[in-house]
């Protein structure tokens, strides 16, 4: 899906405006996209936590058959599954932040450059694993929250619908789950470990 075409005609960029060296643009862009993906995962984590909390409160207050619907075991099981997905996503988001911190080393000796290259490969693998896992959790928690809210879950009056829409957009931004799964599997070491 293209939203726009950008055409640069007659643009001259001076040497002082170049970021990085020759043939380094891809690595810089790759790192920037990874940072963006991790920030989106952090945003998704906040949205999932909010949806979880809203849904839990709704189950405590919504009455059916003379009791809060949160007393029904089937709904308790669904909330437990949502809590598991939420905590897995939280752990993965922390892992991604750690991978970014480790790959953020500066320039230096050849050994430092080799370490940075290895860190970049690890960063790519970790970020893709995290974006995939957070996407799964966002879909599970978002859909679960909407379903547990019943018909109210899809109305604009209830904030849950807006959080669900945002989670759906986050999953598609900077590479969807399929893209990140393919990227993860393409990393060196994946086939040998499998």
Regions found by a protein language model. Give the residues of each.
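Alpha-helical interface subdomain recognition
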Residues: 22, 31-194
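Flexible, small-/acidic-enriched active-site or ligand-binding loops
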Residues: 1-21
């Amino acid at each position: 899906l293209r939203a726009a075409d950008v055409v640069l005609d007659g643009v001259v960029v001076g040497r002082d405006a170049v970021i990085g060296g020759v043939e380094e643009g891809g690595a810089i862009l790759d790192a920037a996209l990874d940072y963006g993906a991790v920030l989106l995962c952090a945003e998704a984590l906040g949205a999932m936590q909010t949806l979880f909390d809203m849904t839990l409160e709704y189950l405590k207050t919504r009455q059916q058959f003379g009791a809060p619907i949160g007393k029904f075991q089937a709904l308790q099981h669904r909330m437990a599954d949502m809590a598991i997905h939420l905590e897995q996503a939280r752990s993965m988001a922390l892992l991604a932040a750690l991978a970014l911190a480790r790959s953020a080393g500066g320039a230096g000796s050849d050994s430092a450059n080799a370490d940075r290259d290895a860190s970049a490969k690890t960063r790519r693998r970790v970020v893709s694993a995290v974006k995939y896992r957070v996407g799964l959790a966002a879909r599970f928690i978002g859909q679960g929250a909407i379903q547990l809210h019943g018909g109210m879950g899809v109305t604009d009056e209830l904030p849950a619908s807006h959080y669900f829409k945002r989670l759906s957009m986050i999953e598609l931004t900077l590479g969807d789950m399929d893209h990140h799964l393919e990227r993860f599997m393409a990393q060196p070491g994946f086939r040998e470990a499998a």
